[in-house]
Amino acid sequence: MSVRTSSRSNKGQNKYIEYLLQEETEAPKKKRTKKKVDSATEKNKKSDSSQEPRKDTENVRTDEVDEADEGYVRCLCGANNENYDAAEYSHGDMVQCDGCDTWQHIKCMTDGKDTIDGLMSEDSKYYCELCDPSLYAHLETSKEAEVSEDEDYHDDVYKPVNDHDDNDADVFLDEESPRKRKRSPDSAKGIHIKSKQVKKSNGSKKRNKSIDAAKSDTAENEMPTRKDFESEKEHKLRYNAEKMFSTLFSKFIVPETIEAKLYELPDGKDVISISQEFAHNLEEELYKACLNIEFGTLDKIYTEKVRSLYSNLKDKKNLELKAHVVEGKLPLNKLVNMNASELANPDLQEFKEKRDKVILENFIVEVPDKPMYVKTHKGDELIEDIAEPQEDILYSKDSIRLHNIDSIDSDKSKIEQTHAISKEPSPSTIINEESLNCAFLYPGLGLEFTGYLNYIGVSQKLRRDIFKEAIGDGKLYVEGRLPTTTAAPYLKEISCSRAILVYQLFPSNDSESKTTFADVVDSLENKGRIAGIKPKTRYEKDFYIVPSKGGEIPEILKDILGSHNDERSERFSRMKSDERTLFAFVVVKQEFIH
């Protein structure tokens, strides 16, 4: 067994050297034998002279192997065989790797600790960050490997925009691509040096600095901080963003606006120089907009804004936006704060507006049909009260101009109003004792009129008669519209499981109500729509108003009532061929009727 000792005086000495030397001397030594040389013969003299250079060569090789066996210096702080001097380094003791025989400072490898107990393997051996990288997840390297442009382009952080068939090599940003550590020439050379097997004790091998160096050098150990790493990362991110914007201006924005005669280059400047100037200013404004002033860091939205600006300004259909940017009509500080919808080309904006308009037209507010519960000290209690909702200001009597007089006895009031109307009947309608006064409000068209409802029938038998109760206060407020082609199949299908009350709506005898009534019927009939009314009670699921012209009865009415309601036909008024009318359909949930 051989002992690794340093041939350099300025290196630290292993504290186990004496123990190992003592152990070495106790082992039996091999005797060396020398060959006797016959000086009498000339042949032996020539052989001796020829062997002398061979011995010198062997001695040189032995010295090189001994120096290689001792190991080499390679530490994270930058120390290596070329610049290491114990008097100049104050990083403390060093430790040697059992895999590649490299010497490293203990504090540098343990992030400032004086012991390496946490880095020792199960067999009490120490391995550096190259031999066993899994032990050094806590370290942050002080130097980052340089990444080439090709690697940045293929890091897949910003994917190329394939909206044109161009073959330009765009530059894309890299926000969180892994860093590659490049080994120094000394470190690469030392890994391939063969090491001798040495018997080690359970303790670690340390390399102590000299006493003179400990007294003279008092500088603090400088380690790379997280702030330095973030600054380097942010710098690279901004550099790639500016490079990407420069390509955008030089290959797309400036040439396309010049070709369309929307922009002219300033005197003394070419496309490259003006593109670099625009790119630098745009990146500066984007950095200011995405900088978190409180923490002094760059928000993650920075990379998203770079993608959005690049893809929208590269779009050939967005020529007007490009012209506004290069001409200065759109300031860069406003450009970086525009959202994706504002940056999109006119075709996309028009499509989005049409889509939103269609969604609003088909929107129907659904009334929740779940039972209401109240939390009390006894638990959850179901609310059985079906009281009418509080009157809204939109339903005030002044706005809808109701002509009925409220009374304490509501039944008596309705009877009196029915007799009053029956004295002056309309020549084309029949008013019976079951007619209910109502007011129709259509805020979407700004139309309103007063009238009355005649009850026609119900699709299923109910526990009790609710045809008056279902209308409530008679204020019919239009909440929305939906196509007739959608509503008719729905009413036909739901009539099998739900009860549907059917009414016929007539206007009052005054000319203003009749004119407004005709406008409502024409509007719904021409557009193929039915009106959705706000439900009046908690057991009502849907409330629809269906138009009819030319004296025709809607097919859906026949499908819902069926032949068993033929006796209800006498309730219909005799309509002329040119008469307009409205039918009300109230979908009821029977389980909530008590």
Swiss-Prot record:
The keyword Ribosomal protein does not apply. Residues 254-365 form the TFIIS central domain. Signal peptide: none annotated. Residues 36-63, 155-164, 209-231 have a biased composition (Basic and acidic residues). The modification Phosphoserine is found at S177. Its main location: nucleus. Coiled coil: none annotated. Residues 165-175 have a biased composition (Acidic residues). Residues 191-208 have a biased composition (Basic residues). A zinc finger (PHD-type) spans 72-134. It comes from the Eukaryota. It is found in: Nucleus. Interacts with the RNA polymerase RPB1 subunit and specifically with the trimethylated H3 histone H3K4me3. This is Transcription factor BYE1.
